[in-house]
């Protein structure tokens, strides 16, 4: 197993020095789901939520979150992102599962460090925004399965999450 990189020899937290790393094209893709009542999903799909266009606003929130990640996660480097895409896929309930929306965030940069945290932050904030905009009709919504799906670029190469 690799050593933790955010601690020095004395065990103190520090921001990793990436000055000597090559700038490469980096991609981070994260995903996560919010489960809800079928009636809540119907409101979102019909565009009749009292607070407005739920998925449109959640998309903008996810993009903003990716750009602000270094302000939220203490040891993340501020990055010049070259692309942030937020996509949603709705899924109607059946006998085996709740209605839900799956969010995917794809973040890219050309730089010395990856964009996995930016993608994960984008997904979480997009899902939180859906919750915020719909909590008046469904306080039981559950965010689940938030994870890194893929990472490409840099010295460590590619990672594709098999779970």
Swiss-Prot record:
Lineage, broadest ranks: Bacteria, Pseudomonadati, Pseudomonadota, Betaproteobacteria, Burkholderiales
EC category: lyase
UniProt xrefs under Pfam families: MoaC
Function, in words: Catalyzes the conversion of (8S)-3',8-cyclo-7,8-dihydroguanosine 5'-triphosphate to cyclic pyranopterin monophosphate (cPMP).
PANTHER family in UniProt: CYCLIC PYRANOPTERIN MONOPHOSPHATE SYNTHASE, MOLYBDOPTERIN COFACTOR SYNTHESIS PROTEIN A
InterPro entries reported in the protein's UniProt record: MoaC, MoaC_bact/euk, MoaC_sf, MoCo_biosynth_MoaA/MoaC, Mopterin_CF_biosynth-C_dom
Transmembrane segments: none
Pathway: Cofactor biosynthesis; molybdopterin biosynthesis
GO molecular function: cyclic pyranopterin monophosphate synthase activity
Subunit text: Homohexamer; trimer of dimers.
UniProt-annotated catalytic positions: 132
Example of a GO biological process term: Mo-molybdopterin cofactor biosynthetic process
Catalytic activity: (8S)-3',8-cyclo-7,8-dihydroguanosine 5'-triphosphate = cyclic pyranopterin phosphate + diphosphate
Binding site for substrate: 75-77, 117-118
Gene (UniProt): moaC
Protein name: Cyclic pyranopterin monophosphate synthase
Family named by the database record: Belongs to the MoaC family.
Record keywords, A-Z: Lyase, Molybdenum cofactor biosynthesis
Matching HAMAP family: MoaC_B
EC number: 4.6.1.17
Source species, domain of life: Bacteria
